[in-house]
Swiss-Prot record:
<dbReference type="InterPro" id="IPR012340">
    <property type="entry name" value="NA-bd_OB-fold"/>
</dbReference>
<dbReference type="GO" id="GO:0006412">
    <property type="term" value="P:translation"/>
</dbReference>
<dbReference type="InterPro" id="IPR019979">
    <property type="entry name" value="Ribosomal_uS17_CS"/>
</dbReference>
<dbReference type="InterPro" id="IPR019984">
    <property type="entry name" value="Ribosomal_uS17_bact/chlr"/>
</dbReference>
<comment type="function">
    <text>One of the primary rRNA binding proteins, it binds specifically to the 5'-end of 16S ribosomal RNA.</text>
</comment>
<comment type="subunit">
    <text>Part of the 30S ribosomal subunit.</text>
</comment>
<keyword id="KW-0694">RNA-binding</keyword>
<protein>
    <recommendedName>
        <fullName>Small ribosomal subunit protein uS17</fullName>
    </recommendedName>
</protein>
<dbReference type="InterPro" id="IPR000266">
    <property type="entry name" value="Ribosomal_uS17"/>
</dbReference>
<dbReference type="GO" id="GO:0003735">
    <property type="term" value="F:structural constituent of ribosome"/>
</dbReference>
<dbReference type="Pfam" id="PF00366">
    <property type="entry name" value="Ribosomal_S17"/>
</dbReference>
<keyword id="KW-0699">rRNA-binding</keyword>
<comment type="similarity">
    <text>Belongs to the universal ribosomal protein uS17 family.</text>
</comment>
<dbReference type="GO" id="GO:0019843">
    <property type="term" value="F:rRNA binding"/>
</dbReference>
<dbReference type="GO" id="GO:0022627">
    <property type="term" value="C:cytosolic small ribosomal subunit"/>
</dbReference>
<keyword id="KW-0689">Ribosomal protein</keyword>
<keyword id="KW-0687">Ribonucleoprotein</keyword>
Amino acid sequence: MAETTKATAAEPAADEALVRGYRKARRGYVVSDKMDKTIVVEVEDRVKHPLYGKVLRRTSKVKAHDESNVAGIGDLVLINETRPLSASKRWRLVEILEKAK
């Protein structure tokens, strides 16, 4: 018990990075940018039918945080899962992969 170690300023950040869990990354198309600092992204998920084996396309719409309002409708974007930013926002815009024409 006499041996106590004090954490330096650099150690908590390193420990925090190890504690933080896996965060999902998704690609999708922006379908709405009418809100301030928020975009709606349609994400496609491909699943195999359990009985017949056919690959099905399932889409879901998620709200993502766009701090600088740079994404527009039709852009292909990369989003990452993040802490809850509002009642419905759990994703953050990482980068715009392809601008709409």
